[in-house]
Every structure is written in structure tokens, then in C-alpha cells.
Amino acid sequence: MSEVLSHSCVALSELSPGEAGTLHHSNLNGILRLRLMDLGFTHGALVEVVRKGPGGRLLAVRVRGTVMAIRHKDAVRLLVSRLR
């Protein structure tokens, strides 16, 4: 099982491909926040960055066994604790 490196949170966008973190907080509001929650982006969910797209504008992430793309500007607002 993975171990948390520290209690400090970083933006999901700061993780490199292959790195994962536990979702702690979302600074998103409105319909986007609800949509991401419906897709599994909830407190305590394991989120892994699978790949970063050209120019870094999109991230492919795995959450609850599903890979999906999210925009960098939204990933900046999702705070995670890095996992080892």
C-alpha cells in the first residue's frame, strides 16, 4: 500500500505521469464541481496522473479505475497529498 509523503497538499497538476495522490480538497464551484464528484473526484479518492497532453493543457488521470482527461486549469484547483 502507498504511503503519504507529507501532509501538505499540492495541486494535481503538479504531479508527474505515474505519480498519484489522495484528493483532499477541490477549489471548484458549480456544475463542474458536481460533475467531477459524479465521476469519482471525492475526498479521499486515489487520483493518478497517467499522461500529460501536448503543451500541458490536458491531463489524463485515473480515478476509481477510469481514465479521463481534465483541463490543466481545473487540475490546478484539485489539491492532493502525494503518494509514494
Residue ranges and their predicted role:
Residues 2, 76-84:
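Glycine- and charge-enriched low-complexity intrinsically disordered segments
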Residues 1-11:
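Long, charged amphipathic helices and adjacent flexible linkers at domain junctions
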Residues 17-74, 79:
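Amphipathic, hydrophobic secondary-structure cores in small proteins
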Residues 13-15:
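Short, conserved, surface-exposed binding loops centered on an aromatic residue
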